Amino acid sequence: MKFKDKLKFYVITDSNYSDEVSSVEKALKGGASSIQLRMKTSSTRKMIEVGNKLRTLTSEYDALFFVNDRLDVAQAVNADGIHVGIDDMPVSKIKEIAPNLIIGASAYNIDEMKTAEYEGADYLGVGAVYSTNTKLDARNLGLDGLKDISKIANLPIVAIGGINHSNVENVLECGVSGVAVVSAIVGAENILKSAENMHELIKKYIK
């Protein structure tokens, strides 16, 4: 299975909602195919401790494991990849240091998309499609903006930002390779059930 096929159901951790390890285990059981560890305020030691546990879980479920922003942590826990924003380490530098990692890059507009492609990213995280409480500084792109980028991008696109069970089908109709979700899964009362339901919706569009 190519890595692109595993981008379809991409879950990002958030300890404000639930413990990373237990929420990821339930999400994987419910069908998540990629996991991203995002721990912006934690110590490096804590990130590595949690990352090692998530690496074990994702391997058991044959899912991809990404670390947000931190190349050192991604390497320490033997992650499959890293996801970076426009202000983080340049994609080209990551490729020099860790050529085997899958690199995702955030893009809020066509210029940022082109920069990510030029620098050698492997996939794009495009959004925010809808307003979101998990990333308050995110710029809203909307469905039209997502469609515009989808039409011209040469890389797989993972849509992100405010995606939930009621709007995910509208997002998938834009021709993306996957959707990234935070609160709709890890913030759910029943994470397993929410993941299963989301997986069923995604499968209608991406086999």
From Swiss-Prot:
It comes from Methanococcus maripaludis (strain C5 / ATCC BAA-1333). GO terms for biological process: thiamine biosynthetic process; thiamine diphosphate biosynthetic process. CDD domains: TMP_TenI. GO terms for molecular function: magnesium ion binding; thiamine-phosphate diphosphorylase activity. Pathway: Cofactor biosynthesis; thiamine diphosphate biosynthesis; thiamine phosphate from 4-amino-2-methyl-5-diphosphomethylpyrimidine and 4-methyl-5-(2-phosphoethyl)-thiazole: step 1/1. It catalyses: 2-[(2R,5Z)-2-carboxy-4-methylthiazol-5(2H)-ylidene]ethyl phosphate + 4-amino-2-methyl-5-(diphosphooxymethyl)pyrimidine + 2 H(+) = thiamine phosphate + CO2 + diphosphate; 2-(2-carboxy-4-methylthiazol-5-yl)ethyl phosphate + 4-amino-2-methyl-5-(diphosphooxymethyl)pyrimidine + 2 H(+) = thiamine phosphate + CO2 + diphosphate; 4-methyl-5-(2-phosphooxyethyl)-thiazole + 4-amino-2-methyl-5-(diphosphooxymethyl)pyrimidine + H(+) = thiamine phosphate + diphosphate. One of its GO terms (cellular component) is cytoplasm. 2-[(2R,5Z)-2-carboxy-4-methylthiazol-5(2H)-ylidene]ethyl phosphate binds at residues 132-134, 162, 182-183. Signal peptide: none annotated. Condenses 4-methyl-5-(beta-hydroxyethyl)thiazole monophosphate (THZ-P) and 2-methyl-4-amino-5-hydroxymethyl pyrimidine pyrophosphate (HMP-PP) to form thiamine monophosphate (TMP). Its EC number is 2.5.1.3. Mg(2+) binds at residues 69, 88. SUPFAM superfamilies: Thiamin phosphate synthase. Binds 1 Mg(2+) ion per subunit. 4-amino-2-methyl-5-(diphosphooxymethyl)pyrimidine binds at residues 36-40, 68, 106, 135. This is Thiamine-phosphate synthase. Belongs to the thiamine-phosphate synthase family.
